[in-house]
Amino acid sequence: MDHAEENEIPAETQRYYVERPIFSHPVLQERLHVKDKVTESIGDKLKQAFTCTPKKIRNIIYMFLPITKWLPAYKFKEYVLGDLVSGISTGVLQLPQGLAFAMLAAVPPVFGLYSSFYPVIMYCFFGTSRHISIGPFAVISLMIGGVAVRLVPDDIVIPGGVNATNGTEARDALRVKVAMSVTLLSGIIQFCLGVCRFGFVAIYLTEPLVRGFTTAAAVHVFTSMLKYLFGVKTKRYSGIFSVVYSTVAVLQNVKNLNVCSLGVGLMVFGLLLGGKEFNERFKEKLPAPIPLEFFAVVMGTGISAGFNLHESYSVDVVGTLPLGLLPPANPDTSLFHLVYVDAIAIAIVGFSVTISMAKTLANKHGYQVDGNQELIALGICNSIGSLFQTFSISCSLSRSLVQEGTGGKTQLAGCLASLMILLVILATGFLFESLPQAVLSAIVIVNLKGMFMQFSDLPFFWRTSKIELTIWLTTFVSSLFLGLDYGLITAVIIALLTVIYRTQSPSYKVLGQLPDTDVYIDIDAYEEVKEIPGIKIFQINAPIYYANSDLYSSALKRKTGVNPALIMGARRKAMRKYAKEVGNANVANATVVKVDAEVDGENATKPEEEDDEVKFPPIVIKTTFPEELQRFLPQGENVHTVILDFTQVNFVDSVGVKTLAGIVKEYGDVGIYVYLAGCSPQVVNDLTRNNFFENPALKELLFHSIHDAVLGSQVREAMAEQEATASLPQEDMEPNATPTTPEA
């Protein structure tokens, strides 16, 4: 046996011993001395806020322009190769995705390239994540497309008598204008939220909500891409039940499908599925994932151009990709009142997706991202990008994993990827004009695999949390059938309602003691745990406030089995039986327990003033129930103390304080003490502010821990028993008993 094993102490023999006083709240406060806090005046705070120092200026620049912090510290020899490989790998994936997601956004494909260039450059300056890939994202693109199609439907009549069927260019120009307006407004919203430090809004989009939402969005994207895969001409729908209408329209026109288009799409679909499995299986051995999407684009373009699929077989292709960058244009702000709901949804969803992926990769690589600065960065990318005719962007999950997985160290990898897109925009775009839309459709559908795999969340949430399962399902169903905008609003409302439900219907437990320890556990969970005679310990795992205060009081009486009203009723019934037996009607009308103190705040008995000293009535007056009446009472446990475990209560509002005061009074009326154990300083402050301690004696009901309250209760009962014994008259003592005197 080695030295470590010789010195190892078995867990069952490890002990700790503590000897200290029983800490009620007043006793503990006597042992503590509050630290003096230096409070700054408003003038000092303003002076400090507006004081300009070089360090403060530098920190502001670092915060608003993170590139000024990480670029000077760039380790060229260590980072450049990884950023180079990552940038190329991300760029070859960004090209087909930019073209494909433009189709989802209902704008010409070249605008997908613009959206893959401008925002990426801007994010490099303002973003705090080193690894995410900014640009078009399927869900956001689909939401943009929904707005564009709603305001500019396929069958719109353009002013001047040009029908949309024959005026595709005019219709697309209007849709671009709508997309620019939505993008500008969503960017302004994101920027303002970031400046106001509202980065915390992402916490309201819980993981089940986001995953249910993106899964529903994947179904929307899938149905939107079917028409391109089958090569059929159908109207594009948006709004409520759009996914149903789109599916029905494709199925009704399936007899007119283009076999050549379907064949090319399925070929690319199979290639991508098999290739991605290969990449996943051999990712440890491959220096970088095989750029399958880029190969699919090259192969599809080559086959289409070689066999002249567009002219010979009527296969829809990308079409003209004009070379060069468009000059800046002002978005149409007059559309804001028509798109503000969509802009809010796009702003929040885009930020939520971005910050979740950014935090995941940041935790993996050991750095931090700033949610507020991410909002500002996205706001700048969208608002300024809209001037250059881009549509709303976000973090692409698939590209981010590629950018990080291929060795990317900084956002210079993203800049390199955007430069590859710029090369296509300026010089080589015409090479992809023959690319079949079915190929882009297959690329999009294959990249939805990860989102469809989120259906596996359902059995997990079924096992772990029915509430989170409810959030997932309601988000999915509402987003699927109501549309992504109203579905998101519905999902957020449902998620907030579950928070209220959890606090309104928390778990209530009656605790017992693990024998010979100060450990108190749920008595229903373990056989070894036993209740302490005469004491009930009641626990709640939520705050006590207006929504659950009445439920708390009811649960206390139900779970502990100690109901003051029933106790009072039983005693009065015993009095009536006794009166009937002895034939004294006056006894039946006697008061069983008289308590002069009232602590509910409304009917409180006013304290008496005597010699300028305020005297409060006692909290609990213990009265002796005549022994001759005991036989008329139902047999049961004689509870003398109820301990409320507040270790998991983080606040109490005014309604909750009144409820607690009522509980103390109600139990006090039948001679039962109510102790509060484990109150946090916040809860004590809540009780103090709401005048719970108007009677100073109530502070004696607060204890530092459950064990302190238990010991305090036992000491109190022991002292009361000694006093009762000492007060017995001499004739009640045993005949031969000799009074003892304490030793000197």
Swiss-Prot record:
Record note on quaternary structure: Homodimer. Interacts (via STAS domain) with CALM; this interaction is calcium-dependent and the STAS domain interacts with only one lobe of CALM which is an elongated conformation. Interacts with MYH1.
Residues that hold salicylate according to the record: 398
Region (Disordered): 720-744
Keywords linked to the UniProt accession: Cell membrane, Cell shape, Glycoprotein, Hearing, Membrane, Motor protein, Transmembrane, Transmembrane helix
Listed GO biological process terms: bicarbonate transport; chloride transport; cochlea development; fructose transmembrane transport; negative regulation of monoatomic ion transmembrane transport; oxalate transport; positive regulation of cell motility; positive regulation of cell size
Locus of motif Involved in motor function: 158-168
Localization (cell): Lateral cell membrane
Database matches in InterPro entries: S04_transporter_CS, SLC26A/SulP_dom, SLC26A/SulP_fam, STAS_dom, STAS_dom_sf
Cited Gene3D superfamilies: STAS domain (3.30.750.24)
Span list, region Extended region for STAS domain: 505-718
GO cellular component terms, semicolon-separated: basolateral plasma membrane; lateral plasma membrane; lateral wall of outer hair cell; plasma membrane
Catalytic reaction annotation: 2 hydrogencarbonate(in) + chloride(out) = 2 hydrogencarbonate(out) + chloride(in)
The organism of origin for this protein: Mus musculus
Membrane side Extracellular: residue ranges: 106-108, 152-168, 231-241, 254-258, 308-332, 389-396, 433-436, 482-483
Membrane spanning stretches: 76-105, 109-126, 138-151, 169-196, 207-230, 259-282, 292-307, 333-367, 371-388, 397-406, 411-432, 437-464, 466-481, 484-504
SUPFAM superfamilies, per database record: SpoIIaa-like (SSF52091)
UniProt record similarity statement: Belongs to the SLC26A/SulP transporter (TC 2.A.53) family.
UniProt-annotated site: Controls the electromotile activity, residues: 398
Keyword Cytoplasm belongs to the record: no
PANTHER family the record matches: SULFATE TRANSPORTER
Name of the molecule in the record: Prestin
Protein's gene: Slc26a5
Domain STAS: from-to ranges: 525-713
